[in-house]
């Protein structure tokens, strides 16, 4: 058998183009590769060069499960109540009695870091993970956690690098009107507003909340809005008129200013079968644009819990198991893009 020795620069270049899940399995091949996959410069290079994997994960029965591939490093010994995804990292809120703790996990590398809370608090809070877009710093060097208590009585920031909490004194008045469960886009977090007239954003660089207008004039009625992301490269907004059998999709791939997003209407689906969906509200959407298919996670507590895969030829439904300990606790679906991003400082 002939052994082929390639120049290390070429090996580095080849490996940087492989998906993160493949590299995660290769990290124990040799010590040099393992060290390379932990190198911040290689992590950044691989993140930008490799094709993004867009997986769907589900939070149900206090655990996170993969619906498309086996991520063995998802903790199965932690009761997870909330989860937020950013750059391949999962920020999880755990329940222990009436108290909660925070833990950041990279399912691809298996790294886990517990976050000590500033004070004891219960589970009535919203959480988000993001990073500052400072050109002098790498994103992995400036990850922060945002925590909003119920009623927005307290808003806190935790910096992973300094391992410290701070309280934000200036908070946007619309914060208390946001829907829990935001999405991460280019380091910032976005939520839909209760009023449905705008999107609420949090900029992790300036640590400020901002109100962002919708790309269309909102008209009340049988209208449902949902916010999601595509491979963390595009922000996705869905507007559905179930009474008319119509779904419109808007996409944003860049931020023009602090309060303006660059939206473009991607496509519209019209079909009679949409009227037959037993939908109270849409919780999450995922999209395969080339196939013009929308995967819809619906809130239908009175019937079976279903995922609806909607296309021009109708829809099909897939059932999933309810949380038997609390039938009102709906499974939470979210888009996940694996990465080698490390938890700094290493713990």
From Swiss-Prot:
Any single Pfam family the record assigns to this protein: FBA_1
SMART domains named in the record: FBOX (SM00256)
Q: Which domain of life is it from?
A: Eukaryota
Q: Where are the Kelch repeats?
A: 138-187, 306-347
- Domain F-box span(s) in chain numbering: 1-50
Gene3D superfamilies (alphabetical):
1.20.1280.50
- For whether the record's keyword set contains Repeat, the answer is yes
For whether the record's keyword set contains Cell inner membrane, the answer is: no
- LRR repeat placement: 59-82, 152-177, 196-220, 261-285
Q: What is this protein called?
A: F-box/LRR-repeat/kelch-repeat protein At2g27520
**Native organism:** Arabidopsis thaliana (Mouse-ear cress)
């Amino acid at each position: 058998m002939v052994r082929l020795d390639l120049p290390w620069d070429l090996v580095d270049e080849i490996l940087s183009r492989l998906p993160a899940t493949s590299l995660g399995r290769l990290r124990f091949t040799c010590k040099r590769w393992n060290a390379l996959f932990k190198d911040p410069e290689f992590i950044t290079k691989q993140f930008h060069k490799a094709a993004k994997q867009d997986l769907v994960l589900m939070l149900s029965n206090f655990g996170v499960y993969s619906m498309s591939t086996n991520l063995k490093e998802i903790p199965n010994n932690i009761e997870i109540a909330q989860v937020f995804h950013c750059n391949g990292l999962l920020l999880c809120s755990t329940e222990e009695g009436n108290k909660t703790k925070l833990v950041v996990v990279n399912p691809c590398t298996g790294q886990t870091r517990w976050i000590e809370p500033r004070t004891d608090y219960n589970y009535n809070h919203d959480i988000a993970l993001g990073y500052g877009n400072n050109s002098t710093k790498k994103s992995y060097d400036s990850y922060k956690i945002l925590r909003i208590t119920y009623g927005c009585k307290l808003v806190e920031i935790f910096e992973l690098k300094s391992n410290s909490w701070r309280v934000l004194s200036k908070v946007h008045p619309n914060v208390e009107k946001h829907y829990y469960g935001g999405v991460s886009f280019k380091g910032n977090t976005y939520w839909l507003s209760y009023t449905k007239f705008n999107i609420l954003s949090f900029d992790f660089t300036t640590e400020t909340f901002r109100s962002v207008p919708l790309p269309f004039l909102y008209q009340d009625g049988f209208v449902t809005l949902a916010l999601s992301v595509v491979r963390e490269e595009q922000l996705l907004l869905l507007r559905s008129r179930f009474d008319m059998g119509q779904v419109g999709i808007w996409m944003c791939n860049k931020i023009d200013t602090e309060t303006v997003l660059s939206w473009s209407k991607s496509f519209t689906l019209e079909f009679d079968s949409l009227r037959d969906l037993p939908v109270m509200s849409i919780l999450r959407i995922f999209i395969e644009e080339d196939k013009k298919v929308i995967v819809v996670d619906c809130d239908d507590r009175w019937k079976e819990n279903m995922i609806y895969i909607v296309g021009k030829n109708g829809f099909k439904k897939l059932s999933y198991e309810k949380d038997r300990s609390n039938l009102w606790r709906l499974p939470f679906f979210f888009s996940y893009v694996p990465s080698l991003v490390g938890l700094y400082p290493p713990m």
